[in-house]
Amino acid sequence: MIALIQRVSQAKVDVDGVTIGAIDKGLLVLLGVEREDDLAKMEKLATKVMSYRVFSDENGKMNLNLEQAGGSLLVVSQFTLAADTGRGLRPSFSGAGTPDQAKTLYDAFVEFCKAKGVTTQTGEFAADMQVSLVNDGPVTFNLQV
């Protein structure tokens, strides 16, 4: 399971010209599901995302996690993160989770974060989305479990 996280000062996701999810300070999470992923991996990755210290403390060091910084999550499904780009000029998605598996784990990730008290907005699974963000830093990390 893969989460490309970006520290943002604001982010939003639109579907058909309508904003369906938006946050101010927080993390934009592009979430990719691979074939071997399961609920245990989802919980491990969600915990890591929420606990990862990417926000600056009073000394300017990345020492605060999402909760400590008072941030929110915007979670967007992104199957292309599971692409194999090692050969040729066209990505292969054979390692990506099935649509049913990915939706189940995406929904579980969102609900897990909400259950931990994190304000969580979402995109729309499998929709054609327009994601806008202001990357703060820029700070971007690729987390995998």
Curated annotation (Swiss-Prot):
Q: What is its EC number?
A: 3.1.1.96
* Extent of motif Gly-cisPro motif, important for rejection of L-amino acids: 137-138
Subcellular location, in the record's words? Cytoplasm
Reactions the enzyme catalyzes: glycyl-tRNA(Ala) + H2O = tRNA(Ala) + glycine + H(+); a D-aminoacyl-tRNA + H2O = a tRNA + a D-alpha-amino acid + H(+)
- Broad class of where this protein is predominantly found: cytoplasm
Q: Which is a GO BP term held by this UniProt record?
A: D-amino acid catabolic process
> Which Pfam families does this UniProt record tie to the protein?
Tyr_Deacylase
* GO MF annotation, one: Ser(Gly)-tRNA(Ala) hydrolase activity
Class of enzymatic activity (EC top level): hydrolase
Q: Which GO terms describe its cellular component?
A: cytoplasm
- InterPro entries in the cross-refs: Daa-tRNA_deacyls_DTD, DTD-like_sf
Which UniProt keyword terms apply here? Answer: Cytoplasm, Hydrolase, RNA-binding, tRNA-binding
Query: PANTHER family attached here?
Result: D-AMINOACYL-TRNA DEACYLASE 1, D-TYROSYL-TRNA TYR DEACYLASE
* Record text about domains: A Gly-cisPro motif from one monomer fits into the active site of the other monomer to allow specific chiral rejection of L-amino acids.
Instruction: Relate the assembly described in the record.
Output: Homodimer.
Would you identify the family this protein belongs to, as annotated? Belongs to the DTD family.
| Its biological purpose | An aminoacyl-tRNA editing enzyme that deacylates mischarged D-aminoacyl-tRNAs. Also deacylates mischarged glycyl-tRNA(Ala), protecting cells against glycine mischarging by AlaRS. Acts via tRNA-based rather than protein-based catalysis; rejects L-amino acids rather than detecting D-amino acids in the active site. By recycling D-aminoacyl-tRNA to D-amino acids and free tRNA molecules, this enzyme counteracts the toxicity associated with the formation of D-aminoacyl-tRNA entities in vivo and helps enforce protein L-homochirality.
Q: Please state what the protein is called.
A: D-aminoacyl-tRNA deacylase
The protein's organism comes out as: Shewanella woodyi (strain ATCC 51908 / MS32)
The opening ranks of the lineage are: Bacteria, Pseudomonadati, Pseudomonadota, Gammaproteobacteria, Alteromonadales
